[in-house]
Amino acid sequence: MFHLVKGLYNNWNKKEQYSILILGLDNAGKTTFLETLKKEYSLAFKALEKIQPTVGQNVATIPVDSKQILKFWDVGGQESLRSMWSEYYSLCHGIIFIVDSSDRERLDECSTTLQSVVMDEEIEGVPILMLANKQDRQDRMEVQDIKEVFNKIAEHISARDSRVLPISALTGEGVKDAIEWMIVRLERNKKSRPPIYK
């Protein structure tokens, strides 16, 4: 009888775990975003001034509430590392694509890179959140300019949830709003991409 009750208790108390892939070109602020996110959820985080370019991946698991866990994979954005992004597509429930809104010169490269992500069949139906990072800088592009680039790609996304939001990973502005947007989409998409229960 004890084992039955224990089994029922464990089953009812399982948490949904969703995996979110953080992508973007090198120097877009992906790791800063992840470390700021950890700080927002009161977890141990790396001092922002100590962040180095990611070679490989950074992983963080963030308990959002009593029922959900978000597992983030921050994958290096250097051109030589982008070929390994596709290895994560079938495992992810959502994608956050971070754009350096102060780097106009790489906007075309960013657009081409995002388009190659969107066109991959493995992420069909996965919500995509594009974050216009570094909005705290004076030389930033307006969010509307970045949306225009994203809108050209959005026609390939069809009915999938997608959005462009402004953030500053450095100051934390907009970071929690972005995650809240993603959580709603992950729950909405539960039937086509079920979470892992932990």
Swiss-Prot record:
Annotated GO CC locations: cytosol; Golgi apparatus; nuclear outer membrane-endoplasmic reticulum membrane network
GO molecular function, one term: GTPase activity
Residue numbers bearing the N-acetylmethionine modification: M1
Keywords: Acetylation, Golgi apparatus, GTP-binding, Isopeptide bond, Nucleotide-binding, Protein transport, Transport, Ubl conjugation
Per UniProt, location of the Glycyl lysine isopeptide (Lys-Gly) (interchain with G-Cter in ubiquitin) cross-link in this chain: K50
Superkingdom of the source species: Eukaryota
Pfam family, one: Arf
PROSITE patterns: ARF
An individual GO BP term: protein localization to Golgi apparatus
Role, per record: Involved in the targeting of ARL1 to the Golgi. Can bind and hydrolyze GTP.
Similarity field: Belongs to the small GTPase superfamily. Arf family.
Miscellaneous section: Present with 1920 molecules/cell in log phase SD medium.
Protein name in the entry: ADP-ribosylation factor-like protein 3
Organism encoding this protein: Saccharomyces cerevisiae (strain ATCC 204508 / S288c) (Baker's yeast)
Lineage of source species: Eukaryota, Fungi, Dikarya, Ascomycota, Saccharomycotina
